[in-house]
UniProtKB/Swiss-Prot annotation:
Keywords: Cytoplasm, Exonuclease, Hydrolase, Nuclease. Its EC number is 3.1.11.6. Belongs to the XseA family. Heterooligomer composed of large and small subunits. It comes from Acaryochloris marina (strain MBIC 11017). This is Exodeoxyribonuclease 7 large subunit. The keyword Nucleotidyltransferase does not apply. It is found in: Cytoplasm.
Amino acid sequence: MTSYQPNLLVPPEVLSVKGLTDYIQTLLEDDSYLVQVWVEGEVSSAARHRSGFFFTLQDQQEAASIHCVIWNSYCDQLVIEPEVGEQILALGRIRVYPQRGQYQLMAWQLFPAGEGLRSLRYQQLRERLTREGLFDPLQKQALPTYPQTVGVVTSHQAAAWGDIKRTLKAQHPGLKVLFSPTKVQGKQAPEAIVLAIERVIKDGRAEVLIVARGGGATEDLACFNDERVVRAIAECPIPVISGIGHQRDETLADLVADVCAHTPTAAAECIPRLTDWQTDYRNCIARLYIILTRQLDVAHEHLLYQKTRLRRLQIDRQFEREQVLRSRLQNHLLHAIKHRLGQAQQHQQLLQQQLTSLDPTQVLKRGYALVQTTDQQIVRSTQQLQVDQELKVELAEGHFTARVTALQSSPQEADDER
């Protein structure tokens, strides 16, 4: 560094101490950056006086320190009070005191630094989004009855992706899965998660979306408390199931999701199954039978009551009329019950046929096979294949691996190529 060579000639006008101090005061107090500044440091001393708090902030390495004051008018609004040894974040402005030739930070508010600051920011964001209605249960979407395609947003390296694949394959044969990989940890994760969700929405095939990652430390899950991620889930046009962390973890993404499952496996289990729909249908039939039986019992009791009245009246003619009316009512009721039961049975048979036609295993049982490439692409044409390519062939019972030895196009494919 080149040393400064002062000009030793005394000018006609020199600054007074006040003039120099006023100049420094103007520089500091009128600086736009210092009008409202955030300062982080450790409280090295603190005292409460009638006029307010007086304390000193210093760096942990004690390389620098600054005197601070909080006047009484702000003390009742403080989030925390200054305590010696605490790492805090102070909001205030720089003031110069000419009498002492010192500058200090006139603070308005104090916040905990480090983990305390993260917790405070989380709570503030949660309260603001709650006021906006993002966590309102009435805004949540219902899951589709029997989805054919599900989107999954998670890391391809995470165990969560493996858990989801195994669960969906075991409980939902034939379900198509659209995987949109993303980072789920680090500073770049929030933006990556938003882009992954947008890819699924833009594709347009998924009927429900799973957003998941495995458990971890609180800071590892911070990306799922990011406002960008929370709003992306809230604005998603299809239902979202969150499976983030473990039971003890609760992120803002869990609160805004339509269904919160806490773990990736549980999130996959939330996808409605065909067997569940069949069970619901059987339960509906059972409830219908109970209702009709109760109606029949009520009608039977009414008939017995009318019969008793006729016996007490001992009027043959009126008894005959009541007897005829009872027979008509009984026949009408039995006819109505048979008709309703017949309709229910026909509806059940129709639904059973539809369910059977939707079951991919029924097609395989007729001698067909499902041929897939190693990356799980379904083979529909020889144009997708190459000689010596390895294929997975799934039958009604079991599967095996095959290798292409020769290719022969169908007449239609040959015409298309020409």
